[in-house]
């Protein structure tokens, strides 16, 4: 990600009504830029592209360095993830799930990652459904500074078993 080049796009995404759980909905471009200047100090931030242009914003972080790490024993092979889809140009059934799987495959392509940790807002039911479909298990509800969240984990094995079962059920 190139913050100087991408800030207008990021601002337009995080201020969308569907992005309310990012907590930046009413923020200015200046505030969003300073937020991301801070985020990129401790996270890897990616903009994912398809042939048609940018499709996702992905933050990958070390849970030991974040508030979530105070709520469970962090392992060396853990990676935290925040994912935001680009505003849809048109609705396409299954599209978000395909992108979600792409991100999971991307993360698990690293031999350093064996478990993905997420802490979605307790009220974010759409992401709960995607997480469950991918094999995430809810450990517990936690209180983070900015939200009430579900602490969820998905191991590499759980993910690939779930994906395999999903494929078999579709046949």
Task: Label each region the model flagged.
Residues 92-106, 129, 133:
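Conserved acetyl-CoA-binding loop-helix of GNAT-fold acetyltransferases
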Residues 109-120:
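Conserved GNAT acetyl-CoA-binding A-motif
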């Amino acid at each position: 990600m190139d913050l100087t080049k991408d800030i207008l796009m990021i601002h337009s995404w995080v201020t969308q009504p569907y992005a309310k759980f990012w907590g930046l909905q009413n923020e200015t471009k200046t505030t969003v830029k300073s937020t991301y200047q801070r985020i990129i100090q401790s996270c890897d931030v990616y903009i994912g592209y398809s042939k048609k242009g940018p499709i996702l914003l992905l933050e990958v972080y070390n849970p030991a360095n974040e508030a979530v790490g105070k709520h469970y024993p962090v392992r060396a092979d853990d990676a935290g993830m925040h994912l935001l889809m680009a505003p849809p140009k048109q609705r396409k059934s299954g599209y978000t799930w395909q992108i979600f799987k792409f991100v999971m495959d991307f993360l698990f392509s690293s031999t350093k990652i064996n478990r993905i940790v997420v802490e979605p807002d307790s009220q974010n039911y759409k992401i709960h459904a995607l997480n469950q479909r991918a094999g995430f298990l809810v450990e517990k509800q936690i209180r983070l500074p900015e939200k009430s969240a579900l602490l969820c984990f998905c191991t590499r094995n759980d993910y690939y078993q779930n994906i395999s079962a999903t494929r078999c059920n579709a046949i």
